[in-house]
């Protein structure tokens, strides 16, 4: 079985990683996280999970590009991978396990346990237990909050796609930019915008000016924006619980100003990021899963249908920009951690994506 990695998150420590302690830390915390201690099996009608039960996957030094396929039979059947490079710990996760919040939840505890092993004085103060604010909930919050009325689908209209020079097949390029959160907030608030709105508008503005050369007409520039549903529906699940909305800019005249582009992005997001619309989006997906006519359809036919849907929906967005938010670390561990960064894998038609996260006053 071949599984694509979709999320990679990495803490940067203030000292080089000692692989034997990182492996020991993973061995210790994995049994506590049922959502990671899984393997995926193929049935006649659907894929399904079962408890893995094998030893934790082997921690190795980073030697290849990130976000590669995870071959389960070469990874003790696990759907995540832990590697390291110098002072950096890498966690790569297949999105069927969890979303960005669930991944950070696991990575934070892995880092804490590693630091307690390397620095026994931390273990004396903290013990080898999970933090009180770490969730282990595996509730299916989609099903709990599902409502059957007014389901709505997803935009399938083709968006403007960036078709510049690409890296050779199999390669993956990452660029990190680091900026003070406090200064960025001042700039964004000067435009009466949130950080997310500001960054999305800057990306759209760049595409509009540099690739469309400020011309009108043509396909819309559309940005897929993951929305964490937990704050809207009182959930702390470590399962996937997010939906995608799309921030759209459709140039209908020449020479838009940045402020006009930003206003379009804000209007697009504000019309979608509300509890009722978010319910409609995930209720559409849940209703498809509950469709009694679909249940007896063999898996290979479902895979063909899903591939067609995926290819159409993939080119409905120019790119994806996800904001993991501020990564909070307990005070006692902060002196050992330099920072965090994260990124997501490429997908069909989207060869340039953005991931935002922050730690203390540094945004990456």
Q: Where is each model-derived feature located?
A:
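Helix N-cap motif at beta-to-alpha junctions
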Residues: 16, 96-97
């Amino acid at each position: 079985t071949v599984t694509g990695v979709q999320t990679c998150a990495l803490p940067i420590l203030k000292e080089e990683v000692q692989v034997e302690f990182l492996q020991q830390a993973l061995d210790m915390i994995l049994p506590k996280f049922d959502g990671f201690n899984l393997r995926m099996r193929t049935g006649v009608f659907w894929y399904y999970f079962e408890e893995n039960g094998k030893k934790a996957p082997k921690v190795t030094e980073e030697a290849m590009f990130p976000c590669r396929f995870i071959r389960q039979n070469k990874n003790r059947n696990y759907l995540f991978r832990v590697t390291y490079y110098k002072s950096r710990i890498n966690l790569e996760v297949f999105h069927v396990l969890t979303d960005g919040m669930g991944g950070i939840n696991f990575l934070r505890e892995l880092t804490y346990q590693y630091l307690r092993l390397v620095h026994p004085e931390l273990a004396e103060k903290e013990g080898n237990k999970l933090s009180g604010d770490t969730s282990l909930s595996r509730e299916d919050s989609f099903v709990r909050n599902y409502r059957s009325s007014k389901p709505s689908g997803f935009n399938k209209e083709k968006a403007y796609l960036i078709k510049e020079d690409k890296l050779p097949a199999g390669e993956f390029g990452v660029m990190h930019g680091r900026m003070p959160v406090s200064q960025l907030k001042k700039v964004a608030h000067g435009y009466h915008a949130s950080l997310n709105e500001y960054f999305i508008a800057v990306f759209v503005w760049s595409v509009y000016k540099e690739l469309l050369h400020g011309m009108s007409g043509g396909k819309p520039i559309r940005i897929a924006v993951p929305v964490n549903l937990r704050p809207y529906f009182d959930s702390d699940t470590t399962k996937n619980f997010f939906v995608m909305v799309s921030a759209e800019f459709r140039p209908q005249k020449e020479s838009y100003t940045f402020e006009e582009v930003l206003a379009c992005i804000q209007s697009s997001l504000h019309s979608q990021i509300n509890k009722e619309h978010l319910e409609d989006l995930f209720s559409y997906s849940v209703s498809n899963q509950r469709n009694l006519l679909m249940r007896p359809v063999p898996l290979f036919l479902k895979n063909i249908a899903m591939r067609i849907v995926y290819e159409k929906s993939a080119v409905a967005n120019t790119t994806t920009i996800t904001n993991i938010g501020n990564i909070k670390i307990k005070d006692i561990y902060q002196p050992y951690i330099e920072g965090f960064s994260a990124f997501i894998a490429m997908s069909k038609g989207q060869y340039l994506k953005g991931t935002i996260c922050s730690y203390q006053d540094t945004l990456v």
